[in-house]
Amino acid sequence: MFETYQPLFHEIFTQVNNAKDKPKKVAVLRKHDAEGLRNFLMVAFNPDIEWMLPEGDVPYMPNDAPEGTEHTMLHHEANTFHNFIKKLVFGTTDQWMIGNTQINDARREMMFIQMLEALSAPEAELVLHAKNRTLNKKYKGLNANTVREAFGWDENFIDQNLVAQRGGKPVDLGRMPQDIAESQRRG
């Protein structure tokens, strides 16, 4: 039967927390697999991704509207995280790739605060845990190893099928699929 209700991320992570062992935790993540969830967990656990925001508390007003009303969902907002991060790209020269170079730090911080205020309070809290790298402290068993196993990612958080397809060439590790496609076009 097709399920029309899409649980919020904190509901999914509570299911992971309550699962008795790692295979069940992995099964919960696989059951709810979606691009937004993958993006969120990537920025939460990949050590090669750094948040381009000040350390510490964020001055925002939590949204007190009931869940499911008057706010955006993290499922959708997770696809905008490129505005707030930079990623270490491995290849012939290791360098940081900024997700969105078109915005300055003040605008980036304002956009982040606006995103938090538009989310429900529990989902905004999840984003802060991801930013502070403390998600695994709130949800037992939700860690880098579990996430990598659930989504078939290698130790560099790259899809193992993509690595196998590319022959495991070191220059491709850490690159985004669109970067690989662009380099293939160039020859």
Regions found by a protein language model. Name each.
Residues M1-G187:
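N-terminal nucleic-acid-engaging modules of covalent nucleotidyltransferase systems
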